[in-house]
Each structure stands twice: as C-alpha cells, then as structure tokens.
Amino acid sequence: NVTVTANYTAKSGSGNKTNKSTGSGNSTNSNSNRRPNSTTTGNVSGGRTTVVIDKNGLSNTSVVSATVNGSSDNFVIKITESASASEEVVKALMAEYGNDISAIKYFPMDISLYDSTGNNKITDTTGLSISITLPIPDSLITYAGNNKVAGVVNSKLDKLTPKFSTISGVSCICL
C-alpha cells in the first residue's frame, strides 16, 4: 500500500467552484537527493511546458516530461513540498487506512499549474488535461510497479491508475 501524491486544482462545472486534488507518497530521504529548482522542459501542442522541481527525493529529473492538452499557451508546472499537501495526504491516508499509517510509505508533493511566467497559478483548468511523467521517488524505487498513486479530493484518496515505464534506465510513473 504505497501511495505517491500529486496536487492539482481543477475547476468543475460552472461558477467559481474548484476541486483541489492532492497526491501522496512518503519520503524520509536526506537532502542529498534534492534537486532544488531543477527545470525540465516538455513539449505542448503549439506551446511549451516547463516543469520546475523543488522537492527532496526526486532524482533523475532528466526524464521528466509534461504535456498540457487543450491549449497552445505556454505553462509552468511546479512540483514542490508544501505543509498543506502533506497534511491533506496524512488525513486522507488515515481516513482510508485508519489512524496508524506508520507501515505505509508515501511521498506527498504539490503539483500545480502556472502561466508561462510561473507567477500566476492557473485555477480554471476547464478544457485542459495534463499528462506528466516523473521518476519514481527515490524512497519508493524498490517498490517499482507496486507503487500506488493517488490525489486527495475532499479529504479522501482519489486513486489514480498510472502507467509505469523505464526511460533511459530510470523507473517512471506516467499519468
């Protein structure tokens, strides 16, 4: 029962209502595997998506790619560590598996979409879909394809069905 977490905001329906999703996973790694502010650029139809990673425990960032479908604009996807994402993940894991989650390895991260400047968070994602490939977090590599991936929606796990692949010898999660 390993969970890798992603965090994104998606607008649903009409009006200003948004649904916030947070993925989960666990990292007890030291800072030696940190790639602060590492940047990878992926292609988008008619535009470019830049992925900025500022999170401990994600090595091999050269395999990161992302595509934003539904727009020809340029975007920045930021993968960061945030206390709020971590708290939401813990709450959702406890709701799903009980109060003792000490046996579960998880890796919480905040994955958010920004405009091309990287300063303005995109909250209305109507018509957009995002495909992203990330290396399996360092602390979860040994579990390979047995890893589970989820977001958090309304304080509950939203279990996702990723594909696992190997790119240049690096185990990856594709969503």
How does the language model describe each region?
Residues 42, 161-166:
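Short, exposed beta-strand/loop patches in secreted or surface proteins that constitute
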Residues 8, 134-136, 166, 175:
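Hydrophobic residues in beta-strands and at strand termini
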Residues 10-146:
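Feature for mature exported/ectodomain regions
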